[in-house]
Amino acid sequence: MPVVDYTARPPSEGEQMDQHYRAAWDGLTAPGAPFAWSVTDVRGVPTRTYDAAPPNLALLWAGSVAHGDADYLVYQDERMSYAEAHAQVDALASHLAAIGVGHGDRVALAMRNYPEWVLGYWATLKLGAAVVGLNAWWTGPEMEFGLADSSPRALLCDGERLDGVVPYLEALRADGPMHVVGVRLDPDAGLPVDAVRWEDAVTGAADLPVAPMADIGPEDDLCIFYTSGTTGHPKGAVLTHRGAASNLLNLAFWQTMAGAAQDMAVAAGEPPTGSDKQSGESYPGSVLAVPLFHVTGCNCCLHPVTAVGGRLTLMHRWNPEVALELIERERPSTFTGVPTMVRELINSPDFDRRDTSSLAHLGGGGAAVQPDLVQKIEERIEGRPSTGYGLTEVNGVISINANQFFMAKPASAGSPCPVMETRIVGEDGTDQPTGGHGELWVRGGNVFRGYLNRPEANAESLTDGWFHTGDIGYLDEDGFLFLVDRAKDMVLRSGENVYCAEVEAAIYQHPAIAEAAAFAVPDERHGEVVGVAVVLLPDADLAADALRDHTRALISGFKVPEHVWFLDDPLPRNANGKFVKRTLRDQLVGTPAR
């Protein structure tokens, strides 16, 4: 990390926290410390890895048996303890082993956020097989693609997904057997050949030998998650046990380091603003509002909640009022959702009527967190705002920003985690200096193996272990990462790059805005200009020119939206909660704007 000299003048509060932050960081990563790391050869590349990382994630699940009767999974009016979950995982693993699933095989999961997704995940890992997390929003043909691409030995899916897959099963099985376990099927629903209901698979396992835990190495495949691309077929990112274990320790490191830095500041008589904020009584765990078939839901929520013996409350679908009801009832310490969900939660008319005092952290990842949202979180809950920047291809997070650090630099994605090397690479392929903009490249123990069956994509995105994120950003003098935008989410206006995230951040500072998405609109004179789709808060009133005046006061004139569409319905999103700008462009460009 860069060294900053504060001896020439008294340090500000932010600089004081920075000194404690660096001291805590250095102490926790020193040789022999809990988060010490070494350089290891991983796939022929020198790679930073944590010394204390577990060799596989199946050990994490095995250790959770110690939590016994504590609540593990909550879904609507259903509750399942750790002991009950272990019994079902063992039974399902025995069933899968009996039909031939073993080390190196794959098991696909295709369902909503049901408890069975979690149980199927751990049962698959116990056998040394890899999970294929299929997008539950996919259509039948998209499911066919994912199954053909990944060739799973078994498919665990709910009734809605099964109906979409059945027409393709015979063709898919031409290349090999694919056993089906149906989840939460209607009692009178039929079953295809070589299929069984979940409850029959679990109860029938009583007559089968108990499947032992496989011998699993760090570089064995853990899961395949498909990236949420907006063009062409999605790509299956192959994640390893080493990568997921590294991500788990990245999350634990930041929480430990931030707490240690605050304790140092208080002990030095320099308590930072907000350090006296205390959440109410809570239980370790989270209300999960994002899908389990993405790394935010699985690697960044399911894994750490399980590691601490916490309670995971699953939502069938996103609804801010239901989420607030669950937070009040279950009293989780965290809420896991993308920033648009956090904004809807705070804007909900139910927010002030519900008890959210249990939340120690309210934040999310998957998209940029606008500075105005950071301030709203700080003002409206007892917990602290937090965010993480990451990608499917890195098993979760690259950097984290939370607590006082977030308030000091709310526009930053945080400091890259200890095992993450970073480069900012310009268009000419050279590394950029501090403050210079370029594409972020990362290398570390949590970087994925590559894309399944995509050698050309791997050649384009991986260079000597460095993953090209496709995100444009820069590092400041303190080593904090700032994201400017996606490399392909820009407007090129008369040769000037306009980053959509900057436009959106300015628009969101207007109090009438509920949702906003900026995108490129073709223009004969400028090549491209900025267009924006906007949804207003209930009972709000805003004219397009007033929005432009507001935006012009915050950003350069050439970045101000020339086309404004006010929409009554929520903006379209993909399964991970991100706005689908391609859909917006297709729907709006060419229609009257204001």
Language-model features: locations:
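Conserved AMP-binding/adenylate-forming core of the ANL superfamily
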Residues: 52-53, 69-114, 118-122, 139-144
